[in-house]
């Protein structure tokens, strides 16, 4: 590069340096002016009013969000409760009907106990078949007979009518069944009425 070119280059750089310096000063002045204009705007009454409105709107939005969360939780609880009630209605819907039929089963059992096998064997056989059909029909609806003779007393399924000493029987065991119990699925419809042995 010739000396003349170097001088020209230096001159060009210096001129541009001055231009950049002037541009930077102008930008700084504009920034200062903007900040001077902004400072009074923050204290302006309309700005304060807008800030209060924004705060109130944020509070209202938060309240509405909390309400919606609570409403969704309540809706979920109602849905679960309804599902449980529908399932129970399907499972235990026949409970009233079965409770109404239990006295018929009791009457058939008493008739079988009182019928003399020697007097009329066909009648005894007919009662046995009727009883079997009845119990089979109940089993189709998940009804189970509770006949606890010889078992340990269970207050969840048995109702103790009295307690008696019973030689040879373990204590707290069922020695006599007055009336058999019934349960539908896992729910006891009627507890078995029993006499329990003492020590």
UniProtKB/Swiss-Prot annotation:
Q: Where is the composition biased (Basic and acidic residues)?
A: 1-24
Disulfide bond positions: none
GO MF terms here are: adenyl-nucleotide exchange factor activity; protein homodimerization activity; protein-folding chaperone binding; unfolded protein binding
**InterPro entries hit by this protein:** GrpE, GrpE_coiled_coil, GrpE_head
Question: Mind naming one GO cellular-component term on file for this protein?
Answer: cytosol
Subcellular location field = Cytoplasm
PROSITE patterns xref list: GRPE (PS01071)
Which superkingdom, per the lineage? Answer: Bacteria
Q: Which GO terms describe its biological process?
A: protein folding
Q: Which UniProt keywords apply?
A: Chaperone, Cytoplasm, Stress response
**Coiled-coil regions listed:** none
- Stretch list, region Disordered: 1-52
Family, according to the entry, reads as follows: Belongs to the GrpE family.
Q: What does this protein do?
A: Participates actively in the response to hyperosmotic and heat shock by preventing the aggregation of stress-denatured proteins, in association with DnaK and GrpE. It is the nucleotide exchange factor for DnaK and may function as a thermosensor. Unfolded proteins bind initially to DnaJ; upon interaction with the DnaJ-bound protein, DnaK hydrolyzes its bound ATP, resulting in the formation of a stable complex. GrpE releases ADP from DnaK; ATP binding to DnaK triggers the release of the substrate protein, thus completing the reaction cycle.
Q: Describe its assembly.
A: Homodimer.
HAMAP family, alphabetically? Answer: GrpE
Name of the protein in its database record = Protein GrpE
